């Protein structure tokens, strides 16, 4: 909870999982429903099936679900059995939103990390950790081993999910943790480790269970996370994928085979410890562990080593998703978790994924332990089954697993695993439970009994019905406390026998683990076969597989050794279960279910529980529950984004460098390291494998750790695990000796967490140490308080403290504070005394995690960090921690540093995803690399240094931490920079705590952490997340670290161990080098967890790079582990671990947080989208008219907003609206509303979203007024119509107020007027060329022509003077707008032109001609030369109407084919009034209209005349015979009797030419006068302006004269008679002046016109006319030769002109008609030229 309290902000990232998986690895997914862009479910807790989950993730989820049956204890007390089945398992679907998360990125990252030097450095440690995890978890199918083996990266994702679920269902966390633990080694570890913090402490927590059994207990008791109903998921894969992936956002690996996530095996390991406490939990834990181990491809192979029974079953469940576990797959099937991992949410804000990974929960869930027990048939099945799990994996079994009383074996194992099992026991025991389930069951049962003694109240008997196959119909009988208590009583007895058996089996496993560690390193990584084959590359997978195989083979000896090494691991694994049963209601539901593993629900149940657990809200974490859960669910739903995965990987790498190592372990190098370590060749692995080697490693690493404070972490683990004295032993030797299994494994584990390689060694060592450390950390915290407490009791107390903190985090911050205080005291004791080391285990865990991260990443920094951590924590805890941690770091740095660089990054990542699939690793590495090249670069450089030397890796780690920080902040796809800022630990915390993010229990965390310096922020963050997550994290670190979950999500192991681990691994591990080292740090992050608080301080203060990386790696580790350690370390680590509040700056960082504007955009988009859907539904025809009218008005009102208009246009919704309203014309009221919508939408100058149906509706609405004719009298809803009309009027007035639609008369609104306004606003440019055709076909043209005719009839028919009323003027304005539409649709459209010309037998043309004449008369009757533009003036209205009339007439007379004269020219030419009216306008209009209007009108009239005579000979004759207007004759009395139109035209030409010359002369004079005197700049500018204006006037006159000349040229074309008539009217009988004007015009056009076809044709036509004039002049001048040459020339010229001009000018003519009226009426020969010129001019115009 303290994590939550402090880093509660982090959950935002989780909430924003869409961007950054890392931050919401576990929590993020469930917290942030942001997986999808616009959807962020912060408040609602949703169960998300994980359809998009990677198959591996799905398998892990299924396994988790199967293992999750531990959740079946009816969600302990508070959760309904039904609650667990929140999510229905669905087949794993590729995560759509964040595909990168799902697949390649992790592999890429893994590859990148592999390649990075830091990878090299970290790979070894990671590998060692994997080996240790594999060896330690091998028997148990430790997640890390499984991940190593299976390349369980995908499953680790589930692990994260499980961790998240744990968070979600803190109460179920215990039970769920068992379930969760199995789900994904990493995930389960993450879940279990978080549980481990909360659940891993189940042993101690169980005693505490009444108070709050675990950190989760807080949540668990108040509100046991509702156990997800064991809804039979289609497959374990589905459930696991579903929940695991989402929750395990950190676990990109789920989506992507990212080893880091799966590396969270320690969860599983821890769960075996739990299984000790609860056979069911242990079995589920083992199964889950196996499942988690094998949940991911890599993970499963790990299980096969323990393939005997648990491994196979866990592997199977895990394999279901990934089919990676070869041997395990069958068991997996049998225990296929059917529900996603259950996230137990701690009420304080820390939620644990009890079965975070539905896939992996089996490992820790009863199902998993059942599986393990069932699967123990293979190897440990007899032993494990001998516990509570008697049901064979193959046959459905109903196992009632009562909590087991601690047995001698358990206590034996518990001595090492109880001390370690108390703190590390959780995670280690869980893990051991998986690896050494018999022993661990005993240990766990001892722990559990100790814990049970306290919380017997929640003794849930999980009746786990495990069919031979993991049937989806798994029955999960959850017996509430009464039954469970009885079951617990039975479990006590059964636990003794089972614990003995499990002790055997765990010892067997442990031996196997040891064998795997020493000789089975290759096997540990994968199923024995897979591992062995993989072992060719000394891959941790091989190590795990070998370890598992050896565990299977050497169950007695190796199991014993492993039990010694991993007894804590197993105990821890079981311990969480045990504690879960009692301590965690939530966990009890899940882990309690697992605790009552004896009869724990089968994997199926566990799976179902886990799936449901997604929805489960931890009782205590109501605050976070809804939002965070929703986010979690959302996380489940949306796979973590690539960036998130990378961030997670990076964070895990940084935070869980060990995690990364574990993930990387799958790589051969890691396996080699692991093998070496397991064999004792590599101290790290040896630490895990052999108690002495562990001690050696511890001692070897101890100096480093001591210097770096990693030892502290180890010490914390060791302290708890062994006597404080041993724990205090700086070297792991003491801790390993005293608690070889307990202390050494925790150390290894912590180291593992610190670094992946280290994590490997620590997987074995830390497995034990984590169990021990987890047990010990809690025990340390409590043992520190009660130095003399039995390890388990200390663990129980510590677990209580941790679990209470976990549970209390959910349930009570006070509990957290108490637990933290207890842990702090324990830490102090460990620091100061025998238990001091143990207590330190917690406090150190964080520091050591950081230190370990740094250590393994950079041995020197680690040493430095270790001293810091040691300084923070007393030397005793510090030293043992350091020893253990350093032991792992020695292994990690020495063998694994290079491999870490190469493999730890790659391999650890790969291990996460799949031991057998480096590509998953590559994805992770890719993600890491993608997330931050900076981190990669730093990590690579650091890793290079670190890889070079053992010390170098720690340095690299330190550097990488800085880089990691950057990585986190600079997540590649991350929208939220803040995520990157969160340290890996915190990232994990954030991921875990994200659910509780909003609870921000700083104070509670601080109280709990009391003396935790770094623990303040880290503890608050890590206390909320750390107390709940601390134990869980310690356990998770132990289990996860040991199993590789640490490596996966050091931080995730804490909070959503797999989630945070994935987060760390993804975040930190994302950076290939950095990620690995970070992951190693994450593994070492177990100690680094304790160091993490320190590391946070260190990060905050000591080194920017180290600070970043350390904060990132250790931060993730410390944040997650450190959060755990902060919570646990604060509790256990006490004062030294406390983080200053200033560190809070880092903790509140929320990852995946959207910026304000993004939230706003998403909200606005969603709001508009919802509005559209709502309105669209209400507009459908099946609704009543009143409803449709109301919705239409609502839509119209919304369309007033530009943003909404843009939205509906952008998404093409407009046509959907009109389609729904297609029958609106049948109802007057609805039609009015519809036309209002159209009108409003048309007021923008944007293209209309029209289709044929919408246009048809618009045209139907034009005539809708008739339908409503009865409106006045008998409209059925007159009142409604009036109401709607008023609303429409208000909208229209608002539009007019905006300056639009000024011509609309709002007082006379009708359906037709609005529709017409809409139609008239359309143009082909806006609506498209199709508009011209459809408008004609749909009757729009006909309606427009009819409207014009109707409006003009009263005016045209009036013989007397017209009384222009406002209504008539309004009608004329409407006619003008209709004519503009006609002009638009007839331009360059011959079909529409012919339609208009033939419409109504020529009535349209007749109406136009009458209107033309009317305008001409009215202009002269009502002069408007005042320049005013008052539209109420009849002259102004008619003048404005005349322009569109002329343009329509010009279009109608345009000739498309010169060979075929224009039909319009013929029809209009037959009406004499057209030519007469045209000459009147041309010659007289200048006297009645403003000067600025004369030019346009003159050009249009000349263009019309040119079109009439260009190709139509009859029209030429009409023009030649036409007489000038009488008014013109009166003004210009003729010398002779009459004046012809031709004479008037020529005079007009000379007048224009003279005016042009005059203007030109004035301009020249003006220029000369200006040149005489010097002008100021202002005067020069004024002169230029004047010249421009004068030049404009000059060209206006020139253009008018030119058009007149073109008209003359067309008249005389091919007609000598007309030529002679014209020549007589010319000055000097010569065309020279005409030629001069035309040449000037031609030059002007040539310079200014574009190269469009119309202009080019016009230019050619003009040139022909000029040439014709010249020839005619030449012929005339040579009159003597006139007879012969002239006809020839004329003929030739005419032919040439005709051919060229007819062809090109025909097109030009009609084109020009629109612009000008010059060339149209030239005579025959000239006609060809003139028309073109005219056309061109017209077009040019």
From Swiss-Prot:
Keyword Lyase: no
Keyword tags: Chromosome partition, Meiosis, Phosphoprotein
Annotated WAPL domain residues: 1140-1648
Positions bearing Phosphothreonine: 258
Positions carrying Phosphoserine: 355, 888
Region of interest: Disordered: 68-100, 119-277, 291-472, 490-612, 675-810, 823-963, 1038-1068, 1112-1141, 1708-1741
Biased composition (Basic and acidic residues): 880-894
Any Gene Ontology CC annotation: chromatin
Bias type Polar residues, positions: 367-377, 586-604
Organism domain of life: Eukaryota
Positions with biased composition (Gly residues): 1117-1136
Biased segments, Acidic residues type: 438-456, 860-873
Function: Has a role in female meiotic chromosome segregation in females; proximal heterochromatin is involved in chromosome pairing during female meiosis. Is a dominant suppressor of both white and Stubble position-effect variegation (PEV), while it is a weak enhancer of brown variegation.
Family, per entry: Belongs to the WAPL family.
The protein's name in its UniProt record: Protein wings apart-like
Organism the protein comes from: Drosophila melanogaster
């Amino acid at each position: 909870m303290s994590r939550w309290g402090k880093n509660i902000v982090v959950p935002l990232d989780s909430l924003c999982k869409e961007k950054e998986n890392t931050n919401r690895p576990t929590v993020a997914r469930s917290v942030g429903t942001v997986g999808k862009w616009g959807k962020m479910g912060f408040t609602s807790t949703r169960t998300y099936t994980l359809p998009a989950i990677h198959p591996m993730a799905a398998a892990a989820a299924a396994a988790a679900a199967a293992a999750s049956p531990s959740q079946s204890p009816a969600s302990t007390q508070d959760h309904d059995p039904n609650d667990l089945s929140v999510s229905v398992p669905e087949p794993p679907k590729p995560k759509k939103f964040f595909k990168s998360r799902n697949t390649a990125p992790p592999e890429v990252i893994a590859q990148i990390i592999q390649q990075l030097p830091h990878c090299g450095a970290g790979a070894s440690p990671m590998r060692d950790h994997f080996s240790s995890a594999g060896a330690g978890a091998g028997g148990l199918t430790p997640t890390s081993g499984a991940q190593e083996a299976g390349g369980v990266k995908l499953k680790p994702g589930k692990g994260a999910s499980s961790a998240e679920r744990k968070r979600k269902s803190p109460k179920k966390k215990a039970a769920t943790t068992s379930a969760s633990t199995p789900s994904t080694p990493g995930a389960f570890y993450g879940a279990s480790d978080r549980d481990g913090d909360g659940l891993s402490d189940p042993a101690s927590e169980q005693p505490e269970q009444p108070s709050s059994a675990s950190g989760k207990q807080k949540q668990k008791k108040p509100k046991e996370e509702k156990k997800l109903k064991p809804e039979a998921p289609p497959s374990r894969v589905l459930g696991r994928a579903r929940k695991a992936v989402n929750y395990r956002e950190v676990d990109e690996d789920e989506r992507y085979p990212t080893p880091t996530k799966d590396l969270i095996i320690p969860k599983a390991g821890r769960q075996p410890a739990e299984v000790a406490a609860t056979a069911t939990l242990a079995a589920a834990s083992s199964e889950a562990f196996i499942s988690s181990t094998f949940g991911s491809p890599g993970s499963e192979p790990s299980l096969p080593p323990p393939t005997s029974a648990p491994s196979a079953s866990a592997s199977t469940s895990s394999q279901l998703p990934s089919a990676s576990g070869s041997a395990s797959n069958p068991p997996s099937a049998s225990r296929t978790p059917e529900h996603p991992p259950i996230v137990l949410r701690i009420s304080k804000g820390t939620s644990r994924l009890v079965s975070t990974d539905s896939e992996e929960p089996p490992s820790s869930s009863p199902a998993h332990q059942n599986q393990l027990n069932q699967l123990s048939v293979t190897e440990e099945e007899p032993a494990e089954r001998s516990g509570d799990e008697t049901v064979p994996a193959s046959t459905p079994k109903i196992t009632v697993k009562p909590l087991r009383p601690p047995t001698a074996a358990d206590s034996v194992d518990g001595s090492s695993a109880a001390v370690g099992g108390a703190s590390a026991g959780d995670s280690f025991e869980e893990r051991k439970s998986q690896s050494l389930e018999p022993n661990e069951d005993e240990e766990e049962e001892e722990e559990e009994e100790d814990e049970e003694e306290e919380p017997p109240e929640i003794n849930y008997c999980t009746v786990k019905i495990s069919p031979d196959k993991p049937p989806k119909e798994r029955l999960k009988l959850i017996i509430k406390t009464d039954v469970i208590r009885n079951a617990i009583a039975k479990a006590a007895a059964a636990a003794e026998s089972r614990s003995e058996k499990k002790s055997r089996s765990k010892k067997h496993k442990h031996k196997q683990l040891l064998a795997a560690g020493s000789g089975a390193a290759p096997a540990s990584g994968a199923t024995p076969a897979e591992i062995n084959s993989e072992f060719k590359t000394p891959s941790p997978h091989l190590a795990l597989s070998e370890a598992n195989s050896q565990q299977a083979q050497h169950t007695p000896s190796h199991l014993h050794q492993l039990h010694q090494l991993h007894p804590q691991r197993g105990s821890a694994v079981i311990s969480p279960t045990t504690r879960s049963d009692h301590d965690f209601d939530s966990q009890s539901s899940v882990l309690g279910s697992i605790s009552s593993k004896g009869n724990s629900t089968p994997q199926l149940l566990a799976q179902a529980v886990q799936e449901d657990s997604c929805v489960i809200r931890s009782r205590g974490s109501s605050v976070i529950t809804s939002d965070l859960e929703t986010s979690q669910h959302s996380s489940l739903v949306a796979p973590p984004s690539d960036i998130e995965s990378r961030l997670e990987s990076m964070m895990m790498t940084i935070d869980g460098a060990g995690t990364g190592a574990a993930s990387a372990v799958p790589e051969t190098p890691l396996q080699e390291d692991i093998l070496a370590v397991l064999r004792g060749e590599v101290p790290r692995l040896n630490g895990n494998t052999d108690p002495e080697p562990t001690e050696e490693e511890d001692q070897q690493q101890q100096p480093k750790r001591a210097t770096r404070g990693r030892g502290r972490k180890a010490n914390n683990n060791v302290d708890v695990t062994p006597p404080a004295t041993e724990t205090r032993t700086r070297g792991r030797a003491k801790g390993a000796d005293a608690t070889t299994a307990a202390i050494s494994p925790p150390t290894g584990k912590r180291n593992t967490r610190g670094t992946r390689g280290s994590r490997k060694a620590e997987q074995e060592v830390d497995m034990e140490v984590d169990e021990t450390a987890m047990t010990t950390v809690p025990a340390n915290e409590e043992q520190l308080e009660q130095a003399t407490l039995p390890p388990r009791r200390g663990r129980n107390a510590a677990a209580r403290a941790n679990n209470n903190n976990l549970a209390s985090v959910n349930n009570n911050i006070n509990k957290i504070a108490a637990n933290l205080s207890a842990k702090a005291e324990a830490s102090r004791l460990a620091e100061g005394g025998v238990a001091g080391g143990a207590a330190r285990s917690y406090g150190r865990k964080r520091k050591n995690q950081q230190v370990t991260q740094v250590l393994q990443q950079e041995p020197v920094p680690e040493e430095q960090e270790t001293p810091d951590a040691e300084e923070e924590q007393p030397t005793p805890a510090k030293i043992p921690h350091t020893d253990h941690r350093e032991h792992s770091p020695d292994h990690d740095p020495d063998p694994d540093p290079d491999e870490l660089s190469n493999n730890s990054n790659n391999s650890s990542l790969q291990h996460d995803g799949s031991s057998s699939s480096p590509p998953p690793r590559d994805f992770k590495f890719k993600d890491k690399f993608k997330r931050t090249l900076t981190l990669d670069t730093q990590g690579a450089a650091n890793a290079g240094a670190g890889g070079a030397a053992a010390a170098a890796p720690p340095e690299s780690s330190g550097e990488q931490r800085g880089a990691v920080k950057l990585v986190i902040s600079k997540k590649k796809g991350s929208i939220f920079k803040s995520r990157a800022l969160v340290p890996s630990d915190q990232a994990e915390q954030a991921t875990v705590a994200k659910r509780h993010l909003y609870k921000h229990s700083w104070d509670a965390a601080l109280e709990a952490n009391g003396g935790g310096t770094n623990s303040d922020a880290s503890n608050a963050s890590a206390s909320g997340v750390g107390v709940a997550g601390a134990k869980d994290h310690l356990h998770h670190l132990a289990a996860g670290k040991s199993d590789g979950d640490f490596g996966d999500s050091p931080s995730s192991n804490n909070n959503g161990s797999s989630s945070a681990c994935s987060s760390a691994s993804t975040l930190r591990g994302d950076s290939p080098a950095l990620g690995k080292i970070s992951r190693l740090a994450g593994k070492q992050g177990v100690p680094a967890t304790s160091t993490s608080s320190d590391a946070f301080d260190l990060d905050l203060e000591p080194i920017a790079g180290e600070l970043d990386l350390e904060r990132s790696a250790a931060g993730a580790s410390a944040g997650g582990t450190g959060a755990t350690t902060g919570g646990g370390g604060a509790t256990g680590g006490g004062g030294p671990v406390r983080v200053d509040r200033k560190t809070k700056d880092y903790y509140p960082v929320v990852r995946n947080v959207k910026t304000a504007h993004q939230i706003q955009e998403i909200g606005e988009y969603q709001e508009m989208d919802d509005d559209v859907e709502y309105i669209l539904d209400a507009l459908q025809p099946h609704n009543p008219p009143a409803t449709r009218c109301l919705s239409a008005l609502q839509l119209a009102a919304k369309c007033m907003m530009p943003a909404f208009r843009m939205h509906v246009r952008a998404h093409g919704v407009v046509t959907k609206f009109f389609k729904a309203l297609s029958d609106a014309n049948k109802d007057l009221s609805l039609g009015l509303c519809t036309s209002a919508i159209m009108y409003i939408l048309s007021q923008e100058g944007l293209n209309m979203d029209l289709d044929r149906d919408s246009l048809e509706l618009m045209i139907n609405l034009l005539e809708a007024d008739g339908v409503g004719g009865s409106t006045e009298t008998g409209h059925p809803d007159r009142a409604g119509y009036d109401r709607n009309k008023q609303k429409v009027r208000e909208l229209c007035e608002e539009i007019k107020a905006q300056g639009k639609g000024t011509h609309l008369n709002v007082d006379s609104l009708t359906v037709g007027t609005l529709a017409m306004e809409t139609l008239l606003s359309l143009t082909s440019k806006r609506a498209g060329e199709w508009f011209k055709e459809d408008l004609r076909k749909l009757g729009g043209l006909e309606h427009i022509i009819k409207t014009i005719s109707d409006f003009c009839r009263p005016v045209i028919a009036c013989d007397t003077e017209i009384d222009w009323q406002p209504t008539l003027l309004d009608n004329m304005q409407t006619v003008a707008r209709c004519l503009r539409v006609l002009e638009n649709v007839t331009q360059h459209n011959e079909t529409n032109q012919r339609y208009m010309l033939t419409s109504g037998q020529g009535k349209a043309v007749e109406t136009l001609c009458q209107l033309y004449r009317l305008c001409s008369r009215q202009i002269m009757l009502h002069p408007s030369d005042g320049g005013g533009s008052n539209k109420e003036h009849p002259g102004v209205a008619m003048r404005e109407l005349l322009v569109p009339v002329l343009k329509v007439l010009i279009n109608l007379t345009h000739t498309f084919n010169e060979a075929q004269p224009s039909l319009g020219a013929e029809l209009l030419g037959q009406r004499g009034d057209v030519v007469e009216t045209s000459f009147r306008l041309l010659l007289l209009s200048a006297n009645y209209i403003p000067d600025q209007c004369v030019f346009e009108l003159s050009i249009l009239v000349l263009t019309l005349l040119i079109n009439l005579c260009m190709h139509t000979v009859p029209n030429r004759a009409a023009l030649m015979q036409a007489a000038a207007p009488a008014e013109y004759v009166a003004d210009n009395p003729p010398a002779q009797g009459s004046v012809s139109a031709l004479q008037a035209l020529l005079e007009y030409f000379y007048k224009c030419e003279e005016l042009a010359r005059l203007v030109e002369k004035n301009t020249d004079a003006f220029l000369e006068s200006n040149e005489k005197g010097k002008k100021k700049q202002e005067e020069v500018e004024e002169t230029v302006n004047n010249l421009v204006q004068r030049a404009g006037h000059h060209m206006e006159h020139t253009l008018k004269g030119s058009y007149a000349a073109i008209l003359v040229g067309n008249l005389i074309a091919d007609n000598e008679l007309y030529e002679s008539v014209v020549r007589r009217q010319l000055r000097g009988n010569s065309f020279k002046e005409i030629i001069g004007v035309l040449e000037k015009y031609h030059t002007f056009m040539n310079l200014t016109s574009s190269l469009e076809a119309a202009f080019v044709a016009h230019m050619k036509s003009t040139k022909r006319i000029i040439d014709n004039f010249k020839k005619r002049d030449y012929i005339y001048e040579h009159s003597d030769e006139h007879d012969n040459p002239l006809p020839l020339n004329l003929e030739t010229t005419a032919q040439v002109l005709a051919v060229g001009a007819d062809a090109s000018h025909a097109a030009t003519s009609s084109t020009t008609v629109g612009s000008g009226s010059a060339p149209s009426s030239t005579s025959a020969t000239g006609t060809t030229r003139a028309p073109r010129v005219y056309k061109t001019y017209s077009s040019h115009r």
